[in-house]
């Protein structure tokens, strides 16, 4: 060794030599590594080449050290990695035609680098963990082919509208920056190509609505920001988005339509936020959603219709929330759900049938809840899960398993019952399943005769290696594995677990009553028992209970425990299913469920009001009632269900609006309408009268009349309308002068002129009026002289014939008044009885239309028929008199003869004379039925046969029929007896018409209302002139002296002048 130079320590010299040698060794090794690449081109130092990768990472060299690379890149280099160096800037131009990817992660770059000509070919640029403060669009415009840009873990604070030039970028990662603001339109230049955006771990507190106008974006991540509220339409514009991740933001509220517009999204991750409720408002529009993860939130409730817009869910994670109950509608609509995680909540209530909609569910996780009762109570909580293969129930404080606990789980293969202190398992509890794996560990089993089956079942199904079960009772078997217990040791010497002896009973009560429910249980153990009452599977805390214990010695000593639940002043909120749970140290037992139903009698909120309305209008009746259960509303008309409006499809019932409509009201709709409210507690009704008003009209057209002098003229004015119109008559546009020859019938609808003379001819006007208007009609009466009468013959018996005709009319009136009055008394009596049976008519006044005078309100309701009209026959018009039927007068010889009537040509005769002359007259029937009847009645009947009685005021239309045309009665009246004695047998012709009194109106087509006749006071005398009727008088032109009949004095007087009524009109 050479001596050390003077002044230089030997140790220092040796150190320098070692460093030089190590560097030379490094250079030699590098050269050896680069030799393989030398054949294809030299690999620049200090990089490593693995074509197409040029790896220059982790060299910790500054930028000036890399200038030598500018022209030394291998020709096939496509990937360049400068990560983990100390690059603070880069302005080195590279020469490569194949470079596509550049990674410069974990450096100290402050801006986006430029690589010269190869920059335009780069498709991937990763600048992770640098100190770039902003995105410069000018720097990015040199990257026209760039598809992936990773700027995560920099110090970028905002994304501006000008941050990105128009480019075909597909992947953008801006996570772990300091971004607080996203300017509107900041991603617009990337909208045609961007597929993935990551903005995790930034400082954004809100997302402006419609900020993402990226129709092709498929994946968006916003995890670990500071977003608290998501507004509606925030993500509108992301039509192709498939996955959205927003974990750990502290989101407390998702407003309605928050995710609207995400029509193709399949995955939504919202874990570790502060959501409190799942509802359809913020799920609106997610029709393609398949995975929803909302674990680690504060969700307390699932709305009944929460899943209406996302019924394609296949996986739902609701674990680690604060759910306490699962209502019946919690999972409605999720028929495609395959995996459901409800673990680590506080569920204590599962409604019956809550899982019945999940027919496709395969995995259900309910670990670490409080649903022991679902297994212990045999409530069939899992009914409907026909496809379930895996059920996790660990950590639910389950103490016993009933034989019905797993009914419906035909496909179950994996059952996890770990961490439950199970004491008893009923035989055949797992018979409904096809278990391949059973996880069970318990040391609390009550090893009595009821558990003997379990040992053999575990062996037969090869589960003895996957379970860890041991006995706790009886004491001499405590701690022993059930697999080691002999079968003869499973005995039942007592019943330590409580047994229910008295179950609460189902009760139906009225609101306000007090209700008592009783539950009794017995146990052979001295272990104290306690009782808990549940309503609809939820524990009742603040209730009034009475508990007592006594010893029961019917089959050995036992402890009997009784609990009485008192419910005072029950209301509708008390309705439900009640159940008692008796518990001691050895387990719990559940009573049957008793249903409490609280009813309330219906009461009306709206009652129908009496209504008066015109024909053709719309009738509207309101009726609403409340009660519990809600009463059913129905309608009746006049105590029945026959609605003319319903048959004609004019009736409309609006149950939601409590309104009953009748369109285009008609007269037949008039009546009493009853609103019936009925529920299980009872029923009641309210009535309203519908009065239909109709303007006056002519039921039958008015017809002109032509009569022969001396005949009786009947002028018909058959009126219709509601209320019944009042009729007045005028003659020749002036007052009608009423004499003893003028009579009115059927409420002035018939004007009868007896012994018509030439002075009676003229224009007669019928004026009908009611509150709705007035109608007029004209009838022209023509009186012609008889061509066959001479003066001598007309003087014979003229006076007697006229007065006999008057007598006939009076007799008819009297007889019909009596018969009709009796009929109306009976009809009115039965109508009132019927109304009292089914109706309670409102007493309020009628509500009249504005155009109807108020005096109509005093006319009463339809339960009392109005004068002149009957409600029950409002649309029926009966005939006044039977037709003549072509009656032909017979002479004394049995052949056709002539009838003598009063004529004397009426030119110079005194029509009020007591003596009248007779002339022969051949009867010719007229076309009008009513005139035929009256004419034949007045002319054909012998005047000798009548017994005249004083007439009475009548209100019946039938009064125009003579008693001779009435059917004989079983009990003849005095009048009929006298008539039978006085009438000659020769006058009782077999052809005389026999018609009942009550058929008159029907045959004439007139309504029931009676006619009003002016009262006539007579002094009746009986006139008999036998043989006169069969004899034809000798009425020659020269003979003026004719036989005269015996004179009779008749005094006619009237209580009311019809002329007064006419003038008043």
Curated annotation (Swiss-Prot):
Side of membrane Extracellular, spans: 41-807
Superkingdom assignment: Eukaryota
Residues recorded as bearing Phosphotyrosine in the entry: 906
Residues covered by the Ig-like C2-type domain: 498-597, 602-691, 696-785
Residues the record marks as carrying a glycan: 91, 121, 173, 189, 274, 441, 468, 514, 571, 589, 687, 728
Stored InterPro entries: Cys-rich_flank_reg_C, Ig-like_dom, Ig-like_dom_sf, Ig-like_fold, Ig_I-set, Ig_sub, Ig_sub2, Leu-rich_rpt
Tissue localization of expression: Detected in all tissues analyzed.
Region (Disordered): 963-990, 1003-1040
Membrane topology: Single-pass type I membrane protein
Keyword tRNA processing belongs to the record: no
GO biological process: innervation; membrane protein ectodomain proteolysis; negative regulation of axon regeneration; negative regulation of membrane protein ectodomain proteolysis; positive regulation of protein localization to cell surface; protein localization to cell surface; regulation of neuron migration; regulation of platelet-derived growth factor receptor signaling pathway
Keyword Isomerase recorded: no
Start-end of Polar residues biased regions: 1013-1024
GO terms, molecular function: signaling receptor binding
Signal peptide (residue range): 1-40
Cytoplasmic topology ranges: 829-1065
Domain LRRNT: 41-75
Record's GO cellular component terms: cytoplasm; extracellular matrix; extracellular space; growth cone; intracellular vesicle; plasma membrane
LRR repeat ranges per the UniProt record: 76-97, 98-119, 121-142, 145-166, 168-189, 193-214, 216-237, 240-261, 264-285, 288-309, 312-333, 336-357, 360-382, 387-408, 411-432
Name of the featured protein: Leucine-rich repeats and immunoglobulin-like domains protein 2
Source organism: Homo sapiens (Human)
Lineage: Eukaryota, Metazoa, Chordata, Craniata, Vertebrata
């Amino acid at each position: 060794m050479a001596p050390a130079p003077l002044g230089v320590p030997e140790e220092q010299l040796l150190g320098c030599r070692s460093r030089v040698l190590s560097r030379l060794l490094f250079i030699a090794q590098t050269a050896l590594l680069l030799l393989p690449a030398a054949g294809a081109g030299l690999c620049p130092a200090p990089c490593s080449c693995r074509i197409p990768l040029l790896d220059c990472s982790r060299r910790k060299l500054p930028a000036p050290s890399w200038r030598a690379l500018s022209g030394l890149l291998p020709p096939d280099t496509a990937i360049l990695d400068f990560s983990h160096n100390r690059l603070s800037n880069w302005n080195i131009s590279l020469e490569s035609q194949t470079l596509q990817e550049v990674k410069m992660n974990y450096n100290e770059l402050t801006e986006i680098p430029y690589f010269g000509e190869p920059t335009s070919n780069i498709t991937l640029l990763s600048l992770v963990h640098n100190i770039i403060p902003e995105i410069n669009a000018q720097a990015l415009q040199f990257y026209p082919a760039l598809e992936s840009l990773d700027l995560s873990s920099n110090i970028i604070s905002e994304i501006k509208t000008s941050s990105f030039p128009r480019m075909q970028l597909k992947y953008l990662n801006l996570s772990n920056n300091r971004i607080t603001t996203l300017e509107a339109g900041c991603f617009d230049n990337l909208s045609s190509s961007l597929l993935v955006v990551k903005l995790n771990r930034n400082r954004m507190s809100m997302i402006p609505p419609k900020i993402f106008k990226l129709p092709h974006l498929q994946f968006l991540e916003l995890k670990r920001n500071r977003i608290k509220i998501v507004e509606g339409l925030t993500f509108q514009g992301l039509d192709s988005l498939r996955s959205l991740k927003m974990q750990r933001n502290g989101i407390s509220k998702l407003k309605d339509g928050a995710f609207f517009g995400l029509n193709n999204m399949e995955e939504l991750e919202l874990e570790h936020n502060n959501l409190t409720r799942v509802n359809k408002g913020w799920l609106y529009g997610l029709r393609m959603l398949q995975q929803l993860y909302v674990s680690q939130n504060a969700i307390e409730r699932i709305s009944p219709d929460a899943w209406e817009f996302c019924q394609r869910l296949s996986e739902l994670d609701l674990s680690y929330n604060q759910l306490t109950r699962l209502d019946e509608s919690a999972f409605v609509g999720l028929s495609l759900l395959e995996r459901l995680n409800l673990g680590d909540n506080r569920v204590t209530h599962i409604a019956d049938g809550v899982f019945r909609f999940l027919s496709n569910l395969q995995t259900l996780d309910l670990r670490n809840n409080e649903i022991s009762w679902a297994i212990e109570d045999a409530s069939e909580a899992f009914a409907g899960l026909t496809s379930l293969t895996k059920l996790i129930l660990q950590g639910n404080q389950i103490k016993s398993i009933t034989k019905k606990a797993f009914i419906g789980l035909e496909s179950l293969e994996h059952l996890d019952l770990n961490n439950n202190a199970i004491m008893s398992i009923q035989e055949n509890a797992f018979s409904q399943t096809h278990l391949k794996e059973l996880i069970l560990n318990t040391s609390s089993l009550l090893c009595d005769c009821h558990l003997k089956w379990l040992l053999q079942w575990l062996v037969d199904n090869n589960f003895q290696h996957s379970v860890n079960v041991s006995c706790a009772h009886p004491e001499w078997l405590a701690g022993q594995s059930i697999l080691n217990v002999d079968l003869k040791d499973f005995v039942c010497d007592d019943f330590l677990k409580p047994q229910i002896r008295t179950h609460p009973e189902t009760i139906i009560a009225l609101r306000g009553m007090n209700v008592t429910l009783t539950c009794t249980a017995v146990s052979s153990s001295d272990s104290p028992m306690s009782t808990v009452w549940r309503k609809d599977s939820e524990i009742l805390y603040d209730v009034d209970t009475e508990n007592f214990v006594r010893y029961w010695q019917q089959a050995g000593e036992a402890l009997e425990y009784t609990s009485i639940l008192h419910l005072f002043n029950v209301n509708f909120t008390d309705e439900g299913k009640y159940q008692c749970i008796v518990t001691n140290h050895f387990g719990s037992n559940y009573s049957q469920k008793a249903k409490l139903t609280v009813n309330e009698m219906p009461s009306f909120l709206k009652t129908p009001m009496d209504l008066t309305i015109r024909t053709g209008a719309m009738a509207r009746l309101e009726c609403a009632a409340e009660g519990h259960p809600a009463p059913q509303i129905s309608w009746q008309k006049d105590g029945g269900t026959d609605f003319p409006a319903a048959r004609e499809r004019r009736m409309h019932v609006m149950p939601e609006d409590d309104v009953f409509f009748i369109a285009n009201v008609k007269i037949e709709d008039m009546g009493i309408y009853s609103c019936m409210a009925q529920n299980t507690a009872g029923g009641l009704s309210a009535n309203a009268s519908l009065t239909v008003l109709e303007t006056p009209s002519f039921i039958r057209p008015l017809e002109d009349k032509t009569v022969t002098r001396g005949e009786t003229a009947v002028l018909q004015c058959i009126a219709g309308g509601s209320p019944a119109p009042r009729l007045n008559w005028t003659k020749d546009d002036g007052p009608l002068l009423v004499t003893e020859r003028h009579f009115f019938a059927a409420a002035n609808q018939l004007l009868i002129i007896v012994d018509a003379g030439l002075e009676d001819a003229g224009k007669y006007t019928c004026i009908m009026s009611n509150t709705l208007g007035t109608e007029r009609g004209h009838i022209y009466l023509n009186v012609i002289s008889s061509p066959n009468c001479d003066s001598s013959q007309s003087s014979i018996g003229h006076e007697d014939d006229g007065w006999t005709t008057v007598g006939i009319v009076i007799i008819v009136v009297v007889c019909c008044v009596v018969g009709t009055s009796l009929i109306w008394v009976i009809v009115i009596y039965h109508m009132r009885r019927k109304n009292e049976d089914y109706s309670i008519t409102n007493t309020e006044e009628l509500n009249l239309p504005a155009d109807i005078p108020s005096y109509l309100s005093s006319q009463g309701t339809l339960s009392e028929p109005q004068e002149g009209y009957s409600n029950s026959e409002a649309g029926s018009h009966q005939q006044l008199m039977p037709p003549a039927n072509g009656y032909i007068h017979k002479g004394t010889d049995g052949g056709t003869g002539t009838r003598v009537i009063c004529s004397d040509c009426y030119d110079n005769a005194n029509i009020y004379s007591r003596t009248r002359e007779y002339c022969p007259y051949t009867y010719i029937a007229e076309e009008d039925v009513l005139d035929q009847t009256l004419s034949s009645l007045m002319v054909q009947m012998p005047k000798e046969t009548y017994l005249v009685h004083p007439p009475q005021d009548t209100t019946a239309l039938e009064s125009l029929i003579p008693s001779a045309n009435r059917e004989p009665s079983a009990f003849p009246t005095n009048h009929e007896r006298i008539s039978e004695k006085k009438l000659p047998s020769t006058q009782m012709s077999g052809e005389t018409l026999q018609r009942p009194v009550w058929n008159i109106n029907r045959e004439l087509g007139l309504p029931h209302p009676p006619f009003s006749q002016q009262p006539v006071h007579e002094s009746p005398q009986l006139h008999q002139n036998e043989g006169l009727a069969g004899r034809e008088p000798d009425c020659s032109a020269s003979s003026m002296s004719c036989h005269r009949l015996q004179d009779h004095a008749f005094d006619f007087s009237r209580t009311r002048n019809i002329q007064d009524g006419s003038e008043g009109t």
